[in-house]
Amino acid sequence: MLDPLAAFVDVGSEHMHVSVGGDTPKVFGTVTSQLHTLRDWLLSEGVHSVAMEATGVYWLPLYGLLEAAGLEVRMVNGRQTRNLPGRKTDMADSQWGATLHMHGLLHAGFVPAADIRRLQDYLRLRADHVASAASCVQLMQKAFDRMNIKLHDVIASLSGVSGLAVVRAIVAGERSPEALAALCAVQIRRRKKQAVIEALRGTWADEHLFLLEQALQSWDHYQKLIADCDRRIAAVLPPHDEAPPPLPRSTRQTGVNAPHITRLREILAQMCGGRDLTRLPALSEYGVLQLIGEVGIDLSIWPTEKHFTAWAGLAPGSHDSGKRKKGVRRGRNRTGQLFCMMAQSLVRSKDIALGGFYRRLAARRGGLIATKALARKLAGWFWRVMVKGDDYVEQGLARYEEQVRKSKERALKRLAKELGRELVPLSTADHATA
């Protein structure tokens, strides 16, 4: 069914080309007053549905403005609006997009609700600060390497309590290896005190000490910014219910980069309708918070878990042309990247079935494919818990390996039957031979 009042906006950094029903486009600027004029013009024309390309971040101000005005706004992938070769202009793109939208050929991409977008902005900014702080630690390590100080070879991390205590003392002027080693935690001194003392003997060049001082100041600066982000994130989260449903005590350790928000696990469970997503393997409180910041709490917009995993870029692609079949690799969005990072934490797990699944697949297909497959399983469980309310029950590595063994045995029996043979247990065969 045709919609002659469907509009399309070709978004740019300086101009917005708007066409209604495929008619000659009108051009608007991108300053705030021009965006208000664009909105008023669309409303005066009787437009109720607007589509636009996701061009960088330029579409976000207009999207929020039109959404607040009550219009149906669709953010579409630029691949859907490609014009015929030789007709690439902003005016033509706007008309062609409006024609496609008028015929119902443009599929809306996922855009979270306004409150989730606000949380998303804070979380992404915080992640940028965490990455910048990590680069400061690398600069500290570089300064130590230039001074031939091998502290990072004998302690776990320069950003830990002991590492930072030593760095601050060096910046303050302390040079004695014994005095610096005394600042380390008692566990380190008890196990490898002499190794730490030897690692702290080096050359104290002024330029390298200046690099260390600057890196430490930058580290402290980013820690303050991260703490500011934590306060903003806590402010946009819903208030904590004083009488929440009881949650079983979690034995999972909190990550070093996790936000410092009081009772975050209970708040997340409250947001998700009482579902504790941290029961899923590899999903920490911070991981669940990041996922909610990307996809929100209503995952029913994806009809099935296959739709959700495909949107996240975790489903295997396919491209058939005649007799040729080939997989199509496409980039994973932030949600898919989060699931892949979480999957990596299960690689060395000793008692989780999904860890055994990863190792079995990695031995046969390689680590990259195994990581993607494991991430897809995690994404599927995330969808099922959020939409269907399923409870994840860990079956354990031993039971999983037993299921794999039985599956292999059934496959061998089928193969033996096809070849006209019969499988005989090893103990029975030995007895018959004797």
Model-assigned labels for residue ranges:
Residues 1-434:
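A detector of single, family-specific signature residues
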